[in-house]
Amino acid sequence: MIIWIASYPKSGNTWVRAILCSLLYSSNGNLRLSELEKINQFPMKNHFTDLTDDMFNIEEIAKNWLPAQKKINLDNSIKFFKTHNAFCRYKNFVFTDKKNTLATIYIVRDPRNIISSLAYHYSLDIDSAKKMLFSSKRVLGNETSYKSKGHVYTVLGNWANHYNSWKKLDPENTLFLKYEDLIIDSKLQILRIANFLKKYLKVNFTDSVIENTLLSTEFNNLKFLEKRNGFYESVTNKITNKKMNFFNLGK
């Protein structure tokens, strides 16, 4: 079964995945950025290779959302997946269902603060970033990202619809995190995440793991780790063609 780490882009998804990886996969809570690769993204090309040959047809991708997830869940193990997809229907095809989804962690960020992050990450001017935020028909994915990273179409929609689509899920199995709360009181939010995980996994986190997770996922440390070792999610500026830091301002 899948536990989703869902968010609108540039809302703190990577930060939360860093916390999860620090808690679950690191040595005593001491994160290495490479460990984030243990939480894959959905949808991606490899999820659909034996389901469709038409990777550039958004309806084909939507039609196979559930079959792809059913394939992922064949081994009956719990898996974490990052997604920026809205919890939506496309041409009557639903993104996920209770047969495939165990739980969801959704991260929400003040949309006013997302705009500058979108502009930086996607090499947009501020007006274009605003249009992206408010576009009800926004879809992520293109031939370049497909060839370079295996990305297929992600149905995004606008910020409000995206948030509301995930908000309607079963509250018992959904943890909502605010990006701003992660900044104000990181330890409290880490404890909320840890307690949520205990509902689904046989895990116990010592005080030292919690403290090390707090320290190793602090923004300045993430920035340091990226500078020292690089980060696979960093992007290239489309105007200057230079590699940009993924961890930019952290505000």
Regions found by a protein language model. Give the residues of each.
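Short, solvent-exposed coil/turn elements at secondary-structure transition points
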Residues: 86, 110, 180-182, 216-219
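An amphipathic alpha-helix signature
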Residues: 17, 112-115, 187-194, 207-211
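PAPS-dependent sulfotransferase catalytic core
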Residues: 210-251
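PAPS-dependent sulfotransferase catalytic domain
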Residues: 1-177, 241-251
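Non-catalytic, well-ordered alpha-helical segments in soluble enzyme domains
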Residues: 25-29, 189-203
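Phosphate-binding beta-loop-alpha motif at adenosine-nucleotide cofactor sites
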Residues: 6, 170-196
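Short, glycine/acidic-rich hinge or "gate" loops at secondary-structure transitions
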Residues: 32-36, 204-213
